[in-house]
């Protein structure tokens, strides 16, 4: 039997090559794309999910790979997002990374189109930062500085 994911770590970032695309100019800096990380405690396995123009990308990650991603994303934003099981009758929405992540975590708002709008809506609804501990950011892991 499989494991039904109860929470995702949703990240928002801007890759170095995003500046090459003129159509991304209107998106807020640091919020050009979003994806998700999930952990299966039964298999002790991390899963990375991302929707791109090439299709859906899914990777299973080892501990070093997940450490590298979490350290890289430290300079951007990552939220803990419990999955909602709200049923929606009519969900016509464009298919991009934002709408895909919203469906993944069961978050439905018709007016959200950009990664930054999604981030702001999640924060407003009480979702918390993965990196925050008692209102402060954790120290970056000094043993793996990939910037």
What are these regions (language model features)?
Residues 8-10, 20, 117-119:
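Glycosyltransferase-associated regions of secretory-pathway enzymes
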């Amino acid at each position: 039997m499989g494991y039904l994911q109860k929470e995702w770590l949703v990240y928002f970032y801007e890759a170095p090559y995003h500046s090459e695309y003129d159509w991304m100019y209107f998106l807020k800096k640091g919020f050009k794309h979003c994806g998700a990380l999930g952990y299966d405690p039964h298999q002790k396995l991390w899963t990375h999910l991302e929707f791109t123009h090439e299709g859906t990308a899914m990777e299973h990650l080892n501990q070093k790979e997940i450490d590298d991603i979490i350290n890289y994303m430290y300079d951007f934003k990552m939220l803990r997002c419990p999955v909602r099981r709200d049923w929606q009758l009519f969900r016509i929405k464009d298919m991009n990374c934002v709408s895909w992540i919203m469906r993944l975590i069961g978050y439905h708002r018709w007016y959200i189109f950009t990664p930054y709008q999604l981030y702001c809506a999640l924060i407003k609804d009480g979702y918390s930062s993965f990196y925050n501990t008692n209102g402060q950011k954790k120290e970056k892991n000094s043993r793996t500085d990939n910037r």
